[in-house]
């Protein structure tokens, strides 16, 4: 019997093989999977977010996938509330919550809580977008560095979504986003969390995996998927969903701002930058099981160590 019910966090950078490992573990573990991915929440964004197929989602219970229209917004605070509700229900069913993804802010918010942040303000965001169109996102990143140096250090100047959010929070609250997050009230999760980190030992290997996956997405019809979103008059680059890595670059290609080769190059580069940020977050994690997806027996390694950790948690 578990003193506190267990929960497994399967974390890793993009293209590390988290979904495949999660499904392999689900074959052996009585669990339900909770997606920790800020883009997989959106309906109609399947190829570019590498969602598991509907057949796999029916075979292995998944949560927090396809819960919003791309015109809607999602937040770390809402994720925390949704995840806690799901984890409680899954544990009551006698199963283990298996949280899988690469949105590290969501994992952090779930673990430590988060200061109440203001909801997105369309007028403020539109004003920031107009300023970015005139001055460029690099200029706005420089302004962010003056207002919130800590946030600017963590946010790359090619990450307009996070630059916009940090500036928006400052305009709405008068306080830096980094300060609000740092002051978030730590609240211990009522779970025995087992952390599993999946990442190649060599960054060059991850870079290669990222490029292969994006080119496979293109062959699978990614541009056609984005065209379907592009044709909707209610969607634009002002929406968080469309600013997701890969989608933003494809959108600009459809607006004739990029050539096809440039679009692919920019998308791959942006994905590598995202992976770099994810790895920075992961380096802060302690007491985690580390697995290299390039090892032939990495599934067995992960299972053996996870099984041992679950025994110790009981």
From Swiss-Prot:
Kindly state which reaction or reactions the protein catalyses: adenosine(37) in tRNA + dimethylallyl diphosphate = N(6)-dimethylallyladenosine(37) in tRNA + diphosphate
**InterPro entries, per the entry:** Dimethylallyltransferase, IPT, P-loop_NTPase
GO molecular function annotations of the record: ATP binding; tRNA dimethylallyltransferase activity
Q: What are its E.C. numbers?
A: 2.5.1.75
Query: Which terms are listed as keywords in the entry?
Result: ATP-binding, Magnesium, Nucleotide-binding, Transferase, tRNA processing
Q: Which cofactor does it need?
A: Mg(2+)
Cross-referenced SUPFAM superfamilies: P-loop containing nucleoside triphosphate hydrolases
Q: Which GO terms describe its biological process?
A: tRNA modification
Give the residue ranges for region: Interaction with substrate tRNA. 37-40, 161-165
Which parts of the sequence are marked as the site Interaction with substrate tRNA?
103, 125
- Residue positions binding substrate: 14-19
Q: Which residues bind ATP?
A: 12-19
The function of this protein is:
Catalyzes the transfer of a dimethylallyl group onto the adenine at position 37 in tRNAs that read codons beginning with uridine, leading to the formation of N6-(dimethylallyl)adenosine (i(6)A).
Quaternary context: Monomer.
Query: Could you tell me which PANTHER family the record lists for this protein?
Result: TRNA DIMETHYLALLYLTRANSFERASE (PTHR11088:SF60)
Question: What's this protein's family per the entry?
Answer: Belongs to the IPP transferase family.
- For this entry, the protein name equals tRNA dimethylallyltransferase
């Amino acid at each position: 019997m578990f003193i506190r019910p267990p929960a497994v966090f399967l974390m890793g950078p993009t293209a590390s093989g988290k979904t495949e490992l999660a499904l392999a573990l689900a074959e052996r573990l009585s669990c339900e999977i909770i997606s920790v991915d800020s883009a997989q929440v959106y309906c109609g964004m399947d190829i570019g977010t590498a969602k598991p197929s509907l057949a796999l989602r029916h075979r292995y219970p998944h949560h927090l996938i396809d819960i919003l229209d791309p015109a809607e917004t999602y937040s770390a605070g809402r994720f925390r509330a949704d995840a806690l509700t799901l984890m409680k229900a899954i544990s009551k069913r006698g199963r283990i919550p298996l949280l899988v993804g690469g949105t590290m802010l969501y994992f952090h918010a779930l673990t430590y809580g988060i200061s109440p942040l203001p909801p997105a303000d369309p007028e403020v965001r539109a004003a920031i977008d107009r300023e970015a169109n005139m001055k460029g996102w690099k200029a706005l990143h420089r302004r962010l560095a003056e207002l919130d140096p800590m946030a600017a250090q963590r946010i790359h100047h090619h990450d307009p979504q996070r630059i916009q959010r940090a500036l928006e929070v400052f305009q709405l609250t008068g306080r830096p986003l980094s300060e609000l997050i740092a002051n978030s009230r730590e609240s211990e999760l009522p779970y025995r969390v087992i952390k599993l980190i999946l990442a190649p030992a060599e960054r060059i290997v991850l870079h290669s995996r990222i490029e292969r996956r994006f080119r496979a997405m293109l062959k699978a019809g990614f541009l056609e998927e984005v065209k379907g979103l592009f044709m909707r008059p209610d969607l634009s680059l002002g929406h968080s969903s469309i600013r997701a890595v890969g989608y933003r670059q494809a959108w600009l290609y459809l607006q004739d701002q990029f050539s096809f080769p440039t679009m692919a190059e920019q998308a791959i580069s942006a994905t590598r930058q995202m992976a770099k940020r994810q790895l920075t977050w992961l380096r802060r994690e302690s007491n985690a099981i580390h697995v290299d997806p390039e090892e032939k027996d990495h599934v067995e390694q992960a299972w053996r160590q996870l099984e041992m950790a679950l025994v110790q948690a009981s």
